[in-house]
């Protein structure tokens, strides 16, 4: 998966031509500031791969009918919400018959309740709740995001998935992020692997496999490495990085039948 946000469209297109065909493209940011967007869309339209546009409902703009039915729009909504602007955004997408999904960025229980009111009032069908860590809402995360033993044990998992989690990070593996200056990150929370102006995609992949911290980040650190549920839990996410804690759960590793609530 490639998430793109870069100023030089021609350089980006040249770079993308060196990549495999069967990948997902995600364009993230303010579409009004993307130069030669039509040219980029024309290039992406040559491929049958999945394509997404990720943007905020405030700075949302459908660049042209050239995008119609090509992209899945993932529209982020943060609080407080400008209802008038939200209606304009969703109506614009509906008018062009574009597929879209609303993502509510939730930082508190109050945000969650307000989001539900909007979903029910405006009969929104496709939506997600995206917990946002602010640095000040750890209690909200402990109550609503951290896993309990029952959460871990109730998750279905194949033998294949069990072993995959011991080798790679399911959240990050295979993803790169191309920034406006051309820097390439496997995860934007870690230093850049290189730049599209100076490194080939193959060099960047090799560097991530050999030296990177993202694709192969698994639960092999304390306290997870001493927990009997080590490989049953989801792969580490960005939340662990932002919060500065390797385990986002209530499991007591010294007594798995008890929980740290």
Q: How would you describe each model-predicted region?
A:
Residues 89, 112, 136-143, 211-216, ...:
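Low-complexity, flexible helical/coil segments
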Residues 2-6:
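Short, small-residue-biased leader/transition segments that mark boundaries at the very start
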Residues 115-190, 232:
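A C-terminal junction/extension of Radical SAM enzymes
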Residues 7-9, 84, 145-150:
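General structural signal for secondary-structure boundaries
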Residues 193-261:
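Flexible mid-to-C-terminal extensions adjoining Fe-S/redox cofactors in radical SAM and related proteins
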Residues 11-131:
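Radical SAM/AdoMet-radical enzyme domain recognition
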Residues 56-68, 132-149, 189-198, 208-212, ...:
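Generic structural signal for short, solvent-exposed loop/turn connectors between secondary structure elements
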């Amino acid at each position: 998966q490639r998430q793109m946000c870069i100023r030089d469209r021609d350089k980006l297109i040249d770079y993308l031509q060196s990549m495999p065909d069967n990948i997902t493209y995600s364009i993230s940011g303010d579409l009004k500031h993307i130069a030669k967007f039509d040219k980029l869309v024309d290039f992406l339209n040559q491929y049958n791969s999945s394509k997404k546009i990720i943007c905020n409902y405030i700075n949302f703009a459908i660049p042209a009918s050239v995008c119609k039915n090509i992209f899945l729009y993932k529209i982020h909504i943060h609080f407080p919400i400008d209802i008038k602007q939200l209606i304009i955004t969703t109506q614009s997408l509906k008018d062009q018959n574009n597929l879209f999904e609303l993502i509510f960025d939730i930082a508190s229980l109050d945000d969650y309740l307000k989001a539900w009111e909007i979903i029910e009032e405006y009969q929104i069908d496709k939506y997600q709740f995206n917990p946002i860590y602010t640095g000040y809402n750890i209690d909200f995360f402990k109550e609503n995001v951290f896993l309990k033993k029952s959460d871990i044990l109730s998750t279905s998992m194949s033998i294949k998935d069990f072993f995959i989690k011991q080798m790679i990070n399911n959240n990050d593996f295979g993803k790169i992020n191309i920034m406006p200056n051309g820097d390439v990150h496997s995860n934007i929370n870690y230093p850049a692997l290189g730049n599209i102006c100076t490194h080939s995609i193959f060099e960047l992949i090799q560097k991530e496999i050999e030296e990177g911290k993202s694709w192969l980040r698994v639960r092999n650190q304390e306290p997870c490495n001493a927990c009997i549920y080590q490989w049953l839990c989801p792969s580490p996410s960005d939340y662990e990085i932002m919060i500065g804690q390797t385990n986002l759960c209530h499991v007591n590793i010294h007594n798995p039948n008890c929980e740290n609530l």
